[in-house]
Amino acid sequence: MHIHQTTFIKSAVKPADYPPVDLPEIAFAGRSNVGKSSLINVIVERKALVRTSSTPGRTQLINFFQVTGVPFSLNLVDLPGYGYAKVPLDVKRQWGPMMERYLSGRESLRGVVLILDIRRIPSEEDLQMLNWLRSYKRRPIIVLTKCDKVTKNERARQTAAIAARLEMDKSQLIHFSALSKDGRDTVWQAIQDAVEEDAP
């Protein structure tokens, strides 16, 4: 993927506020502090397109970004992080319906990158997100982040455990490191496959 330009479009909560359905979309979902912002910044080759926060759960809106590139252009959609205990209950209650409306109704959505920390076994919230994607027939792209923080043996062991928890084959999981940028091209290839295969 050769990127010409990446720009922030807008933030939204309700479908009426989403940008027009002009380009295919790939959304990014994951628990708070799983490395979602860092992943997006690395794949679009921008240091601070998506701000990383030391306060988990701070992102409470759906953020839309447009990527103009070759061989295709698309929107990247940053969904709110989930699963952080200190977020106020009323905010948590807004997140579920907000994300479910987007996942179920967005016509241009071609796939969702579900981001997991390779050091952690997927939580109930992770499984709920994956089940949402499956029920809405959205293509999941599973990316395991922070791979530079584990040894080769730990990586193999954790990959097997995560795959078993998700009831997926290990070959379906993408390893990624924001530090070394390993996995960037693989993530883009998975995104391109989703955009091309699920095009109307």
From Swiss-Prot:
Mg(2+) binds at residues 37, 59. SUPFAM superfamilies: P-loop containing nucleoside triphosphate hydrolases. One of its GO terms (molecular function) is GTP binding. Keywords: Cell cycle, Cell division, GTP-binding, Magnesium, Metal-binding, Nucleotide-binding, Septation. Gene3D superfamilies: P-loop containing nucleotide triphosphate hydrolases. GTP binds at residues 30-37, 57-61, 78-81, 145-148, 176-178. Its cofactor is Mg(2+). Pfam families: MMR_HSR1. One of its GO terms (biological process) is division septum assembly. Transmembrane segments: none annotated. Residues 22-197 form the EngB-type G domain. One of its GO terms (cellular component) is cytosol. Necessary for normal cell division and for the maintenance of normal septation. Belongs to the TRAFAC class TrmE-Era-EngA-EngB-Septin-like GTPase superfamily. EngB GTPase family. This is Probable GTP-binding protein EngB. It comes from Trichlorobacter lovleyi (strain ATCC BAA-1151 / DSM 17278 / SZ) (Geobacter lovleyi). The gene is engB.
